[in-house]
Design a protein with these regions (language model features):
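Active-site-proximal loop/helix segments of hydrolase catalytic cores
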Residues: 83-147
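Short beta-strand scaffold segments in enzyme catalytic cores
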Residues: 11-14, 92-94
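Metallo-beta-lactamase
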Residues: 54-98, 177-196
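Conserved acidic residues
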Residues: 43, 123, 150
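Short secondary-structure boundary segments
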Residues: 49, 129, 155-157
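Binuclear metal-ion centers of metallo-dependent hydrolases, dominated by the metallo-beta-lactamase
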Residues: 5-7, 85-86, 151-205
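Pre-active-site segment of Zn-dependent metallo-hydrolases
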Residues: 13-46, 54-64, 75-87, 107-118
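Active-site-proximal beta-strand elements of phosphoester/diester hydrolases
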Residues: 3-6, 20-24, 71-77, 91-93, ...
C-alpha cells in the first residue's frame, strides 16, 4: 500500500506498508478557510520551514514505536533574493515503497540543475504555484523541465471551489494552460499503485 493523502495547502500524509509521515502541517488560522484535519498517528512529521502554515508539528500524533523515515533534502531560498525576505526552505524526497516523492515546500525561485540533480526523474513532484510567497506556474515549468517528474501535483494555491488558501489571482488557471495534460482526482487520496503507469498532472479538488 502506497498512498498520498492531501491534507490541504501544502500538507500531505504519505503512507507506505509499515510507516507513514506528514509533511508541512499548518497551524489552524494560518491558511484562509482551512482547518488541519485529524490524522492517524505517524512515524515522523517533516516541515520544510518554520512558518505557521507549514510547521504545526503539535497537531500530529507520533506512533508509540515510530519507524525512522529517511529523506534526501536540499536547502533553497524561500524567495527570489537568496532568502533575505522569507528565509530558507527545504526540499525533501522520500522513498515510499519504491516511489520517489519530492516535496518542494515553499521554494521561492528558479533553481539550477545542480541543486535539482538528486530529484531528477522522481515519480511524484509536489510543487507550489502561489506566485507570491512561492514560485508560480512559469517558474515551476522551468523546474519541472529539469526534474522531469512522472507525475506533477500542484499545491499552495487558492482553491475556488472551497474558497480556501491564499488569494493568488487564480494561479491554477495559468498552471493548467502551461500543463494541459492534467486530470482531476475524485477524492483527496492517491493510490500510487493505481497510477504507476500514469504520466502527467494530477489535481486534487
Amino acid at each position: 500500500m502506497s498512498k498520498i493523502v492531501y491534507l490541504g495547502h501544502s500538507s500531505f500524509l504519505l503512507k507506505g506498508n509499515d510507516y507513514s509521515l506528514v509533511i508541512d502541517p499548518y497551524q489552524n488560522g494560518s491558511v484562509p478557510n482551512l482547518k488541519f484535519p485529524n490524522v492517524e498517528p505517524v512515524d515522523v512529521v517533516v516541515c520544510s520551514h518554520e512558518h505557521a502554515d507549514h510547521n504545526a508539528r503539535e497537531l500530529v500524533n507520533i506512533k508509540d514505536n515510530p519507524t525512522p523515515v529517511g529523506a534526501v533534502s536540499a536547502t533553497v531560498p524561500h524567495d527570489d533574493c537568496g532568502g533575505a525576505k522569507r528565509g530558507l526552505n527545504k526540499i525533501h524526497m522520500f522513498d515510499i515503497e519504491g516511489y520517489k516523492i519530492v516535496h518542494l515546500g515553499d521554494t521561492g525561485c528558479i533553481l539550477d540543475e545542480r541543486t535539482l540533480e538528486p530529484f531528477k526523474n522522481c515519480d511524484i513532484l509536489l510543487a507550489p504555484i502561489n506566485g507570491f510567497y512561492t514560485i508560480g506556474p512559469r517558474e515551476l515549468k522551468e523546474i519541472a523541465n529539469i526534474i522531469k517528474p512522472r507525475i506533477l501535483i500542484p499545491m499552495h494555491y487558492y482553491m475556488k471551489e472551497h474558497n480556501s488558501g491564499y488569494p493568488d489571482g487564480n494561479m491554477i488557471e495559468e498552471f493548467k494552460k502551461l500543463f494541459p495534460n492534467y486530470r482531476y482526482l475524485d477524492k483527496e487520496e492517491l493510490d500510487l499503485d493505481e497510477y504507476k503507469n500514469y504520466q502527467g498532472v494530477l489535481l486534487f479538488r
